[in-house]
Amino acid sequence: MSEDIFSQFFNLFNNEESGVNWELAKQINNHITKDEEVLPPELSNNDINFEQIFRVIELQSDEFLSYEFSPKEIRLMTPKEYGQWFIESIKHFDFESIESPELSMFGGIGGNNMKSSILGMQFGNLAGLLGKFSWGLSQFGIILPRSNTLAVNHKTFNAKVNNFEANENDLSLAYFTVEYMALCLGKYTQPFENIMNS
């Protein structure tokens, strides 16, 4: 027999590990992207080699730039996987130090769990919406994730690339370069912290 609903709620909202309830964030992401799991058909130009384009970017950036963090692989993901990737790639931020007037209301007994759950719900919503609608993180310019994987939201990537009358290899190269640079900047947390603390 499975747990009663109150035990499930308690387990979901009980968080002793960190400043963010990551399990709650994952569950919300999964709920938002539950209808988005099937990968769409491939791009019309079957000659696109994602690995090859990624290696070109990697070699060029290694030649001219030196970053402590940079992606080592590229992966096509479903919207659900993309949301989960986003959650994993923002865990390097120090969410313990976030203070805002809204979150400071939850001091006292159970206050940290409440703050952790609110942040988990917010990040779960953000991850789910990114998975469902976003073609990449670089368009925001403020959330700087850190990951060894350059994630491509396959569904939204295909939709965007097919909107242009241009060579799909050139478009892919431009898109992946911008995403690659966003991941290389993942060591910087200041823009994101300023938003969270205001």
What are these regions (language model features)?
Residues F50-K155:
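Auxiliary, metal-adjacent structural segments of Zn-dependent hydrolase domains
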Residues E179-M196:
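Catalytic Zn2+-binding segment of zinc metalloproteases
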Residues A151-V152, N167-L171, P191-M196:
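Cation-handling catalytic/transport regions enriched in His/Asp/Glu
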Residues E3-F6, G120, G124, E193:
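Alpha-helix initiation and N-capping motif
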Residues M1-K72:
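A generic N-terminal leader/anchor concept
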Residues T156-T177:
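Short pre-active-site segment immediately N-terminal to the catalytic Zn-binding motif
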Residues P40-P41, G111-M114, N167:
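Short coil/turn segments at secondary-structure junctions
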